């Protein structure tokens, strides 16, 4: 397992977004969104990388376009990166996606990108679908744990079964029809995270519905039915996959 010494707060301040949707819980007794500030001693507000501004096309615009500061949007409108060139914008978008999946290493993330190119369809869609097949992500999406890091911990400590066999590799890619379950002796520990009486009666119906997972919260198990489509995958932030792909091109 890769060492991750930096805190979760640092990931929030680096990206400037509520990346896992749990930002308010990381800063106690605080009413402000501290992740909107840059890391370091001299904190500043994260600035928007791009603004829209109507401009007339000319030689100066063509020159700015060549330098990577402009992206054509329409006949009379261009997107201007006031604060950072195009590369920095692409890098930050890639980092957002990589850090969301519990800081997947750069080498591993690039390998996913290479595999995604070999499949039919859009590279960005293939990349996300492959990441969503990871065992730790399936456990997190099913609602058995509170975070992806907790899901990864369960897998690494051999508390997760795939088709009734122990699987301790968090990056294991689940196949259609696979059954993922938690060891019975660990189920009671996970039950303490929820109001279990309500969860048993509703069988988890108050959690986010995922059509590609058949979940049984009474036994803490689920069946991976099929690879989800992009409209079935939820992110707590806006994501521009075109920038992620252009970063590697």
From Swiss-Prot:
It holds the Pfam family Ribosomal_S4. One of its GO terms (cellular component) is small ribosomal subunit. It is found in: Mitochondrion. One of its GO terms (molecular function) is rRNA binding. The keyword Heme does not apply. CDD domains: S4. Residues 133-193 form the S4 RNA-binding domain. The keyword Ribosomal protein applies. Keywords: Mitochondrion, Ribonucleoprotein, Ribosomal protein, RNA-binding, rRNA-binding. GO terms for biological process: ribosomal small subunit biogenesis. InterPro entries: Ribosomal_uS4, Ribosomal_uS4_CS, Ribosomal_uS4_N, S4_RNA-bd, S4_RNA-bd_sf. Belongs to the universal ribosomal protein uS4 family. This is Small ribosomal subunit protein uS4m. It comes from Reclinomonas americana. The lineage of its organism: Eukaryota, Discoba, Jakobida, Histionina, Histionidae. The gene is RPS4.
């Amino acid at each position: 397992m890769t060492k991750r010494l930096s805190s979760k707060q640092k990931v929030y301040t680096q990206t400037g977004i509520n990346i896992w949707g749990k930002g308010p819980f990381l800063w106690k007794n605080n009413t402000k969104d501290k992740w909107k500030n840059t890391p370091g001693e001299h904190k500043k507000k994260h600035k928007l990388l791009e603004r829209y501004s109507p401009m007339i096309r000319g030689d100066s615009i063509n020159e700015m376009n060549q330098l990577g500061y402009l992206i054509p949007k329409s006949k009379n409108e261009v997107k201007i990166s006031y604060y950072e060139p195009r590369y920095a914008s692409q890098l930050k978008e890639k980092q957002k996606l990589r850090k969301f999946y519990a800081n997947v290493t750069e080498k591993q993330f690039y390998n996913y990108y290479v595999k995604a190119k070999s499949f039919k369809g859009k590279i960005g869609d293939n990349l996300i679908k492959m990441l969503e097949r990871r065992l730790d992500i399936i456990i997190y999406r099913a609602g058995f744990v509170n975070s992806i890091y907790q899901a990864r911990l369960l897998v690494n400590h051999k508390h997760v079964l795939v088709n009734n066999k122990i699987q301790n590799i968090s990056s294991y890619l689940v196949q259609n029809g696979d059954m993922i379950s938690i060891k019975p002796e660990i189920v009671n520990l996970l039950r303490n995270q929820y109001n279990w009486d309500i969860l048993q009666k509703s069988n988890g119906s108050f959690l986010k519905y995922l059509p590609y997972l058949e979940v049984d919260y009474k036994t803490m198990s689920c069946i991976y039915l099929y690879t989800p489509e992009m409209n079935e995958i939820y992110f707590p932030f806006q994501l521009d996959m075109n920038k992620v792909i252009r970063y590697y091109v």
